């Protein structure tokens, strides 16, 4: 029953219309990351998350994309990404970035402080975290200035028509995998030993964003340069895209699970 619900939910979420600007990882990708993260939680933490959310974690995976244009949540419109400076370093401490608010929420809820919050505030904070942690592992959700990094402002091609790299990488989780279920995506994710999981979960959202920026520079950009024709990609090229995406999904899922555990684990 639970697996069937998740399958139905993923199909329903994927059917929602979300603009390219709004949707890091697209709807399916966010749902997959949230589903995988929930599967990694121990029963105690999972139960507390569901208690405050009144739903599963994947249920709220794309909430921020829908809420960003609705008051009073328009304030979060720019929290879906974080700036990179001219020296390829993440910008720290800027309140209009998502990494700033991930760390703010982690600090405000740490050491049992969530118990002093209203249930509604805990819920909204969880909804932010569920989405933003995923966002900051999407290679195109780091902001490169056109002035300092003009090379990253270009177009790909899809059957001869221009397509932005943002549009491609947002949907890369489901690229040539449209029929995959949430369970299939979870089975595809490499599971880590507790020791390796803790190592991956270390650091701040700024560290993770820096890592994502480096992934873009070192792997995504070389793999899909300007003018790449998506419809004519070789099996090797597709495999390269999948290897990049699979690693980012793994990182996002483990880190989201880690953040939720640090908040709720007694």
Enumerate the predicted regions with their spans:
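Bacterial Sec-dependent N-terminal signal peptides
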Residues: 1-27
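N-terminal, motif-rich segments that launch catalysis or mediate targeting to/interaction with membranes
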Residues: 23-132, 139, 144-266
């Amino acid at each position: 029953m639970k697996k069937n619900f998740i399958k139905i939910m993923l199909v329903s979420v994927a059917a929602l219309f979300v603009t390219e600007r709004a949707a890091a990882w697209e709807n399916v990708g966010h749902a997959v990351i949230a589903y995988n993260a929930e599967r990694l939680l121990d029963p105690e933490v999972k139960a507390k998350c569901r208690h405050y959310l009144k739903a599963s974690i994947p249920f709220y995976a794309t909430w921020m994309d829908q809420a960003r244009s609705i008051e009073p949540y328009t304030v979060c419109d720019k929290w879906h990404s974080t700036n990179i400076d001219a020296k390829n370093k993440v910008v720290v401490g800027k309140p209009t970035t998502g990494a700033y608010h991930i760390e703010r929420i982690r600090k405000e809820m740490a050491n049992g402080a969530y118990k002093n919050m209203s249930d509604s505030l805990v819920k909204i904070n969880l909804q932010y975290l569920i989405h933003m942690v995923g966002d900051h592992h999407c290679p195109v959700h780091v902001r490169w200035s056109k002035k300092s990094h003009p090379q990253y402002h270009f177009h790909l091609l899809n059957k001869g028509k221009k397509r932005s790299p943002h549009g491609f990488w947002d949907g890369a989780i489901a690229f040539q995998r449209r029929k995959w279920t949430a369970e299939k995506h979870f089975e595809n994710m490499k599971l880590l030993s507790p020791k390796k999981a803790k190592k991956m979960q270390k650091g701040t959202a700024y560290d993770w964003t820096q890592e994502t920026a480096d992934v873009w520079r070192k792997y995504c950009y070389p793999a899909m340069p300007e003018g790449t024709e998506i419809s004519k990609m070789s099996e090797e090229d597709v495999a390269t895209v999948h290897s990049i995406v699979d690693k980012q999904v793994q990182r996002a899922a483990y880190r989201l699970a880690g953040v939720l555990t640090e908040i709720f684990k007694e």
